[in-house]
């Protein structure tokens, strides 16, 4: 059995709950059993929602669980140069385009398309649906809007990306190779207007830079793995294997969330 490098990558936007404990213990145990490394990464790119207090609580909760991890701990907020370099590579490949749409405009367009005669609603895929409004703009229109200072995100042109990388697959432990399905993600945002990156870009770059060999995470993130595999191919990154574990639910069958304080690790620690 080869040594595995695994990671637990929480966001300091609330207290950890039992679902986080399961994920952390799951990744930690695999690393321990294989003589590998368990990494802790703080995913704090969204500085408006993250706090030092919640980050401190993460360390306290994981220590309370008896976990140890490699140091230093990577923090995404210090990694923006790496994300910018990745975006530059993607721009050079011609697979990014600026998106000037607001969320309200996107939702309105989706509703309009869904109600139009003889048209199908956009496919729901776990990422925000996007009707391709700004993909259809001319280069001149894009340049005019950008020059005038209109805020914009950067989206992946999924069709162009698929044409560049061709058929792909990733390995899901205990299931084997999975063919990448472009319909799982569409033209995803890779750089948000407010922070200049995204979860999808950052996590893909970070997993490669930290030489993670096995990404363990909840089954709710299985669809986005298709997008991450495309980004790996475009950026020439090493490809880890994946294991998407079941979600932890409460007695009513509802997925645990940070807003449920009664199931937070801090709640159990204080009892």
Identify what each model region corresponds to.
Residues 105-257, 264-268:
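Active-site cores that bind ATP or allylic diphosphates and position pyrophosphate for catalysis
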Residues 271:
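C-terminal active-site "lid" helix and adjoining low-complexity regulatory extension at the edge
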Residues 11, 257-259:
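Short linear Ser/Thr-Pro motifs
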Residues 1-118, 219-220, 224-237:
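N-terminal Rossmann-like or analogous alpha/beta NTP/dinucleotide-binding catalytic cores
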């Amino acid at each position: 059995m080869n040594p595995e490098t695994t990671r637990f990558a929480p966001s300091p936007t609330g207290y950890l709950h039992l679902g986080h404990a399961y994920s952390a213990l799951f990744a930690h145990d695999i690393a321990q059993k294989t003589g590998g490394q368990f990494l802790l990464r703080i995913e704090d790119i969204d500085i408006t929602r993250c706090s030092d207090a919640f980050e401190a609580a993460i360390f306290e909760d994981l220590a309370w669980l008896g976990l140890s991890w490699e140091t230093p701990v990577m923090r995404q907020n210090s990694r923006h140069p790496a994300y910018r370099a990745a975006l530059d590579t993607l721009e050079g490949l011609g697979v990014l385009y600026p998106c000037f749409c607001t969320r309200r405009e996107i939702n309105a367009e989706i509703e309009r398309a869904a109600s139009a005669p003889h048209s199908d609603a956009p496919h729901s895929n776990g990422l925000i649906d996007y009707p391709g409004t700004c993909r259809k703009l001319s280069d001149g229109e894009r340049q005019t809007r950008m020059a005038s200072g209109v805020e914009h995100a950067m989206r992946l042109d999924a069709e162009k990306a698929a044409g560049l990388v061709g058929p792909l697959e990733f390995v899901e432990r205990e299931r084997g190779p999975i063919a990448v399905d472009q319909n799982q993600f569409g033209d995803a945002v890779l750089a948000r207007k407010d922070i200049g990156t995204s979860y999808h870009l950052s996590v893909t770059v970070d997993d490669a830079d930290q030489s993670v060999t096995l990404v363990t995470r909840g089954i709710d993130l299985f669809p986005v793995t298709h997008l991450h595999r495309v980004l790996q191919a475009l950026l020439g990154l090493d490809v880890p294997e994946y294991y998407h574990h079941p979600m932890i639910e409460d007695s009513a069958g509802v997925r645990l969330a940070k807003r449920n304080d009664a199931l937070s690790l801090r709640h159990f620690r204080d009892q």
